[in-house]
């Protein structure tokens, strides 16, 4: 629910006037709440949505600030599940239809056209797709200006990737410089929406080795975290580094655990429940493992699958550790559930 995300922003002290409202499925009540809160703008993703926003704003005797999310048909060169800027994706208004959409928005009595939005995907590791999308969007902005529709801002979304394994994504400064070269001389406020690039490598998932299973063809390290805690490996076949907190240096001694290739798996009853495969690790039962780069799309994608309460979250600031999200209890998990009356 998009409205719920807005409410969390406001509850955390966020400013609605600095908040853009994206999403392909905005409901009427969500639009009403966003207008009431005074959001910066709606990123409109379809003609039908534009019509609904106009109706809602008119019913409330106000104008809705909008930016149209344009789909530039650019290959982000990322996992297909998180590619959002191709014409076959569900996001945005096709760049071929965008001129008509802007004309309708400009003619609408209760719509205030502010800008243009473009977000082509997540975990991009190259500059070229960003630049390609920017060039197409700027060409559209020029055509709009010729029609008398002058935009105030350009929102390039997010998508800047991070290093999980051996990727070499551009640094934020490189990303900014590449965009700036194409924006010189333009009177546009530039918005960006970094998420993974800020949070991704700031978080780790800690998990304990419950058992080691040695089979003829494969070794398993069964841990107490699972796909419900960290969905990315199962959903995207994503690779995240797994490091034992206890490093064993003398692996040749009789008492040391030898290095073996392990699949690190959880307790959930699915073969797809894994955090990593074919990892060369020296492990013993009871070891604590750190799954790195879990700060983005970790807890937010977690679930209660297999009746598993979600993990606690700890924020570390210098030498101060604070519980910022308590471990979910079974009672909370079952809250709101009811048995049919006899």
Indicate where each model-derived feature is located:
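Active-site-proximal beta-alpha core segment in soluble small-molecule metabolic enzymes
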Residues: 3-153, 162, 167, 178
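Structured helix-beta-strand junction loops
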Residues: 38, 185-186
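Glycine-rich beta-alpha junction loops
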Residues: 70-74, 120-124, 158-162, 196-198, ...
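Charged (often Lys/Glu-rich) extended helix/loop segments that serve as interaction or gating elements
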Residues: 178, 187-342
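Hard-cation-handling environments
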Residues: 182
């Amino acid at each position: 629910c998009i409205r719920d995300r807005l409410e969390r922003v406001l509850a955390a002290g966020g400013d609605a006037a600095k908040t853009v409202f994206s999403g392909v499925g905005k409901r009427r009540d969500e639009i009403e709440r966003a207008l009431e809160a005074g959001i910066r703008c709606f990123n409109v993703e379809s003609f039908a949505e534009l019509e609904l926003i106009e109706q809602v704003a008119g019913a409330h005797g106000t104008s809705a600030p909008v930016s149209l999310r344009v789909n530039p048909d650019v290959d982000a060169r990322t996992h297909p599940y998180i590619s959002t800027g191709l014409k076959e994706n569900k996001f945005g208004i096709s760049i071929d239809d965008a001129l008509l959409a802007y004309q309708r928005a400009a003619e609408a009595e209760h719509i205030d056209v502010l800008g243009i939005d473009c977000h082509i995907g997540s975990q991009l590791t190259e500059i070229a797709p960003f630049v390609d999308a920017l060039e197409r969007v700027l060409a559209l902005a020029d055509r709009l200006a010729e029609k008398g529709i002058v935009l105030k801002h350009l929102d390039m979304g997010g998508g800047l990737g991070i290093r999980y394994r051996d990727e070499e994504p551009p640094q934020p400064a490189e990303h900014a410089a590449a965009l700036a070269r194409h924006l010189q001389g333009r009177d546009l406020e530039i918005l960006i929406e970094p998420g993974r690039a800020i949070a991704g490598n700031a978080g780790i998932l800690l998990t304990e080795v419950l058992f080691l299973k040695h089979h003829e063809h494969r070794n398993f390290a069964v841990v107490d975290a699972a796909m419900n805690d960290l969905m990315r490996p199962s959903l995207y076949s994503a690779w995240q580094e797994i490091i034992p907190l206890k490093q064993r240096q003398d692996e040749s001694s009789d008492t040391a655990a030898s290095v073996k290739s392990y699949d690190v798996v959880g307790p959930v009853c699915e073969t797809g429940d894994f955090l990593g495969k074919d990892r060369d690790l020296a492990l013993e039962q009871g070891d604590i493992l750190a799954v790195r780069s879990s700060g983005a799309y970790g807890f937010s994608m977690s679930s209660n699958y297999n009746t598993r309460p979600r993990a606690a979250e700890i924020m570390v600031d210098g030498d101060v550790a604070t519980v910022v999200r308590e471990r979910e209890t079974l009672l909370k998990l079952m809250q709101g559930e009811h048995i049919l009356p006899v």
